[in-house]
């Protein structure tokens, strides 16, 4: 059984009401419940955290190593474009991760085109709405299964 941690960055607690034309109408609790059920059905454990505070996400990443977390799915949200500290935390714990974005950041303002995470992530999924989280979970489970084979 693998343990997967899902991290949601700033303002994602507003999903469902914040700019639904960009982010959709699904709420964060709905996304979390869906992922948790899919992980459980596959025989794995999933944990999640949403925070608007950079230090809380960093502390959670640090704790993940000691907890034996096997994979991280992260939507850094606005921290994507600003947080060297979260990048360093992810690199410091050496837990593979997939970067997820609900919107296609490359179709948006130029300042959203740069990510401090993409070049060190296993992969990046953007622009597919809440489906991106499901696809990221599927990819993580495939990666974990492949790494478990002798």
Curated annotation (Swiss-Prot):
EC numbers: 4.2.1.10
Catalytic activity entry: 3-dehydroquinate = 3-dehydroshikimate + H2O
Binding site for substrate: 75, 81, 88, 102-103, 112
InterPro entries recorded: DHquinase_II, DHquinase_II_CS, DHquinase_II_sf
Cysteine-cysteine disulfides: none
EC supergroup of this enzyme: lyase
GO process annotations (BP): amino acid biosynthetic process; aromatic amino acid family biosynthetic process; chorismate biosynthetic process; quinate catabolic process
Record bears the keyword Amino-acid biosynthesis: yes
Site feature (Transition state stabilizer) residues: 18
GO molecular-function terms, A-Z: 3-dehydroquinate dehydratase activity
List of catalytic residues: 23 (proton acceptor), 101 (proton donor)
Keyword Lyase on entry: yes
Keywords associated with the record: Amino-acid biosynthesis, Aromatic amino acid biosynthesis, Lyase
Pathway noted in the entry: Metabolic intermediate biosynthesis; chorismate biosynthesis; chorismate from D-erythrose 4-phosphate and phosphoenolpyruvate: step 3/7
PROSITE patterns in the cross-refs: DEHYDROQUINASE_II
Role played: Catalyzes a trans-dehydration via an enolate intermediate.
Subunit-level organization: Homododecamer.
Family named by the database record: Belongs to the type-II 3-dehydroquinase family.
HAMAP family: AroQ
Name of the featured protein: 3-dehydroquinate dehydratase
């Amino acid at each position: 059984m693998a343990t997967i941690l899902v991290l949601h960055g700033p303002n994602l607690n507003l999903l469902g009401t914040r700019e639904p034309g960009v982010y959709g109408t699904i709420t964060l609790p709905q996304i979390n419940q869906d992922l948790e059920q899919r992980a459980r059905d596959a025989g794995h454990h999933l944990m999640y955290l949403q925070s608007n505070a950079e230090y809380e996400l960093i502390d959670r990443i640090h704790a993940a190593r000691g907890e034996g977390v096997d994979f991280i799915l992260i939507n850094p949200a606005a921290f994507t474009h600003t947080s060297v500290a979260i990048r360093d935390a992810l690199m410091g714990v050496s837990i593979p991760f997939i970067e997820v974005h609900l919107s296609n950041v490359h179709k948006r303002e130029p300042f959203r085109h740069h990510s401090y995470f993409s070049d060190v992530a296993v992969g990046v999924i953007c622009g597919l709405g809440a489906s991106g989280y499901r696809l990221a979970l599927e990819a993580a489970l495939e990666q974990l299964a492949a790494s478990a084979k002798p």
